[in-house]
């Protein structure tokens, strides 16, 4: 689902009787008002210009990787440990240790990740900003971040908030006796919130995201607006552990977790700390974004008792899971299976479970030295016992706690790194040597790279192979454009365009030219590598990109431009065994406006899906525009469809797409085929061009038309070629973290 696009309504006007779409009054731009209020269905091109350089106070020359490398990680760990074990009167620590709070903070930062579009996760430090900083599920995490300010203040630019939030959770586990799998620094702070689609609901805890029996809308993972994953009281507050298990399995699957990882994360996370529901929830004040100015960014101020410590209210549930809440052990499972449970309510009125018939009364310590408590559990905790699959997993851990420790360590490591992309992006001394399958491994370069002479020779072989400009450009685009800037997955490196599942994706036209291109490039690779001197070799992945570059040079020459398209060798080839088919399946594009492809079941019209794709490719509006225009004239459309190919000189890198789109002698109308396409007719009424919604939006939308006019001018051809090549090179190298 695209980012920050309002629902598409049947009309462009609102409910006002005079036809004006704005009900009430217009807001100042500084209040958030603007054109979107008047025309809610207009394309929001701002999603292509998020976190601009001018908003970054560190400046363009700032090198976070270099700064974080100077940190003494042992000293940093000690500083965090001191914060964790020093209770502050303004927010007293349960059991004298903030570790459980920091685990929750890290979990909730990373746990927003969802597989279907790769958005969410801990990168960027998004938990600091709206809406995440004010989600009901993140209540009181504002205090956790304030507790860490002395550490952030000390290390300043050397340590990002994004890294600190997650590393504090890792340190908390270690502080309480758990051995973690490792940690990678490298999360760079952003300075404004990502405009992410979190759901259609306009109220907290709304659940309009479901249809049918319990079908959750893609790409969402959480069950309700404002929750990280599932409702701890059960589906919509129905405290049915078996029904909750259904939500748990689906939500965690959409967070990239299997059943074992899911169970391990729940058991491991709930080995520590407690929930907070000391009194009536209606005594809790507004979230940070709605709180009074004088609260200085803190929210959820409670008027129940002291509002803190023993009187704290967060989720409204009052559960302490174990009798050792600041120590790693197997007590969660021992208690879960050691008692029978009955449904009760917390002092705040929330559903929870208590050990039946008063069993275990007094065995659970109070966080502030009060009388001992009875064992308690969440409805979702009991799901691990009543669901047959989770029950089989967790009962084994009850007898084999060392297996639980191993699985939790790996699952936690995956949780907090899933949005970081390949391990090449992990920094610091705590990065494990082992690379895991979910990290989409690619082999290290084990040969000498091709130089200028070899590159020139390979280009000649590719051009003489019989492959067309269209075939070569389409294949290179298919490989590289699988990249997602959200979770840094995909891209041309690894050469996975020839592996399952990518080779079979509908958007890649697997029964068309793709397999022919693959075979031909493999033959060129084999021939070159067998004859090249010394240890010089070329990978298939490099050849795919080089083929596209060679084709663009040929097309530019046909248009009268002698250019050299940049090419940086160094990609390697992954094997099918290094490729998790199920994990890669979610990268399959359901729409790619750059190729004029629109699959079935998309939630929005094609032009909105184009913006979403461009956003995932980290493209600006000018880059998106020049790429669409160039790819059209190069014949890179899905199945070579003529839609948007506004030129008589296909496979020639001209600005014809823009020139002909702006031609006032062409009249556009919907196709009589009623297939969502359009016909452009000349003055005689003859159909001259056909186009898609993606094509026509560049003439219809005022901002995009302004860009088209740049590239459609009489003097624009050189600039068009230059800008197209630059944008092409950017996409080809989006996954080259080894060189950038």
Swiss-Prot record:
GO terms for biological process: cellular response to hydrogen peroxide; hydrogen peroxide catabolic process; positive regulation of DNA repair; response to antibiotic; response to oxidative stress. Changing residue 525 to P: In strain: H0251/90; INH-resistant. Formation of the three residue Trp-Tyr-Met cross-link is important for the catalase, but not the peroxidase activity of the enzyme. The formation of the Trp-Tyr-Met cross-link is autocatalytic. Heme b binds at residue 270. Disruption phenotype: Cells lacking this gene are devoid of catalase activity, supersensitive to H(2)O(2) exposure and highly resistant to the antitubercular drug isoniazid (INH) in vitro. This mutant strain is markedly attenuated for virulence in mice and displays impaired growth in infected macrophages, but its growth and survival is indistinguishable from wild-type in macrophages lacking the ROS-generating NADPH oxidase (Phox). Keywords: Antibiotic resistance, Heme, Hydrogen peroxide, Iron, Metal-binding, Organic radical, Oxidoreductase, Peroxidase, Virulence. Changing residue 587 to P: In strain: 15726/89; INH-resistant. Changing residue 700 to P: In strain: H0004/93; INH-resistant. Its EC number is 1.11.1.21. It is an enzyme of class 1 (oxidoreductase). Its cofactor is heme b. Optimum pH is 7.0 for the catalase activity and 4.5-5.5 for the peroxidase activity. Optimum pH is 4.75 for the peroxidase activity. Binds 1 heme b (iron(II)-protoporphyrin IX) group per subunit. One of its GO terms (cellular component) is cytosol. PANTHER family: CATALASE-PEROXIDASE, HYDROPEROXIDASE I, BIFUNCTIONAL CATALASE-PEROXIDASE. Bifunctional enzyme with both catalase and broad-spectrum peroxidase activity, oxidizing various electron donors including NADP(H). Protects M.tuberculosis against toxic reactive oxygen species (ROS) including hydrogen peroxide as well as organic peroxides and thus contributes to its survival within host macrophages by countering the phagocyte oxidative burst. Also displays efficient peroxynitritase activity, which may help the bacterium to persist in macrophages. NCBIfam families: cat_per_HPI (TIGR00198), PRK15061.1 (NF011635). This is Catalase-peroxidase. It comes from Mycobacterium tuberculosis (strain ATCC 25618 / H37Rv).
């Amino acid at each position: 689902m695209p980012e920050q696009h309002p629902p598409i309504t049947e009309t462009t006007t609102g409910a006002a009787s005079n036809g004006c779409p704005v009900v009430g009054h217009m807001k100042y731009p500084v209040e958030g008002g603007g054109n979107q209020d008047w025309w809610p269905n207009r394309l929001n091109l701002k999603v292509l210009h998020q976190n601009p350089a001018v908003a970054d106070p560190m400046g363009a020359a700032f090198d976070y990787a270099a700064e974080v490398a100077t940190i003494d990680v042992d000293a940093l760990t000690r500083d965090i440990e001191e914060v964790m074990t020093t209770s502050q009167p303004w927010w007293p620590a349960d059991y004298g240790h903030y570790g459980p709070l920091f685990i929750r903070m890290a979990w909730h930062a990373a746990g927003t990740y969802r597989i279907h579009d790769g958005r969410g996760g801990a990168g960027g430090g998004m938990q600091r900003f709206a809406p995440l900083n004010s989600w009901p599920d993140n209540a009181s995490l504002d205090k956790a971040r304030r507790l860490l300010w002395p550490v952030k203040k000390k290390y300043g630019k050397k340590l990002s908030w994004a890294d600190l939030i997650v590393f504090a959770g890792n340190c908390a586990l270690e502080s309480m006796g758990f051995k973690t799998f490792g940690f990678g620094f490298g999360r760079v702070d952003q300075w404004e919130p990502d405009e992410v689609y979190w759901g259609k609901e306009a109220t907290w805890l709304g659940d309009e995201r479901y249809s049918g029996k319990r079908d959750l809308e893609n790409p969402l993972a959480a069950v309700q607006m404002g929750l990280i994953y599932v409702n701890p009281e059960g589906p919509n507050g129905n405290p049915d552990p078996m029904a909750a298990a259904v939500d748990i399995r689906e939500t965690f699957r959409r967070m990239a977790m299997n059943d074992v990882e899911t169970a391990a994360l729940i058991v491991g996370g709930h080995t520590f700390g407690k929930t907070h529901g000391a009194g009536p929830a209606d005594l809790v004040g507004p979230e940070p974004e709605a709180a009074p100015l004088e609260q200085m960014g803190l929210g959820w101020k409670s008027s129940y008792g002291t509002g803190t410590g023993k009187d704290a209210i967060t989720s409204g549930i009052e559960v302490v899971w174990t009798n050792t809440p600041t120590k790693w052990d197997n007590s969660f499972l021992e208690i879960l299976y050691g008692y029978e449970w009955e449904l009760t309510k917390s002092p705040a009125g929330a559903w929870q479970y208590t050990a039946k018939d008063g069993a275990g009364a007094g065995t659970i310590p109070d966080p502030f030295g009060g009388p001992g408590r009875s064992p308690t559990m969440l409805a979702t905790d009991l799901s691990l016992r009543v669901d047959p699959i989770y029950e089989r997993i967790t009962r084994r851990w009850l007898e084999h706690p060392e297996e639980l420790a191993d699985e939790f360590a790996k699952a936690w490591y995956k949780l907090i790194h899933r949005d970081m992309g390949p391990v090449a992006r992990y920094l610091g001394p705590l990065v494990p040597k082992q690379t895991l399958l979910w990290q989409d491994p690619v082999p290290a370069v084990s040969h000498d790279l091709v130089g200028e002479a070899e590159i020139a020779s390979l280009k000649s072989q590719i051009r003489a192979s019989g492959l067309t400009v269209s075939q070569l450009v389409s294949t290179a685009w298919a490989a590289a454009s699988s990249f997602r800037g959200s979770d840094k997955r995909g891209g041309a490196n690894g050469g996975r365009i020839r592996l399952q599942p990518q080779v079979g994706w509908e958007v890649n036209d697997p029964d068309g030219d793709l397999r022919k291109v693959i075979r031909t490039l493999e033959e060129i690779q084999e021939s070159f590598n067998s004859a090249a001197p010394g240890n010089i070799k070329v990978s298939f992945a490099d050849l795919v990109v080089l083929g596209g570059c060679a084709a663009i040079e040929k097309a530019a020459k046909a248009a009268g431009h002698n250019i050299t398209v940049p090419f940086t060798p160094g990609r390697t080839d992954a094997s099918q065994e290094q490729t998790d088919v199920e994990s890669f399946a979610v990268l399959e594009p359901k729409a790619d406006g750059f190729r004029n492809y629109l699959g079935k079941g998309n939630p929005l019209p094609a032009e909105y899906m184009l913006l979403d794709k461009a956003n995932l490719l980290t493209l600006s509006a000018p880059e998106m525009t020049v790429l669409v225009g160039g790819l059209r004239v190069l014949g890179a459309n899905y199945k070579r469809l003529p839609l948007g190919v506004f030129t008589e000189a296909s496979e020639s890198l001209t600005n014809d797409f823009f020139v002909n789109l702006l031609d006032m002698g062409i009249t556009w109308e919907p196709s009589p085929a009623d297939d969502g396409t359009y016909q452009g007719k000349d003055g005689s009424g003859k159909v001259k061009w056909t186009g898609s919604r993606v094509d026509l939006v560049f003439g219809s939308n005022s901002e995009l038309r302004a860009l088209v006019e740049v590239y459609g001018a009489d003097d624009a051809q050189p600039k068009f070629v230059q800008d197209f090549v630059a944008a092409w090179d950017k996409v080809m190298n989006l996954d080259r973290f080894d060189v950038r």
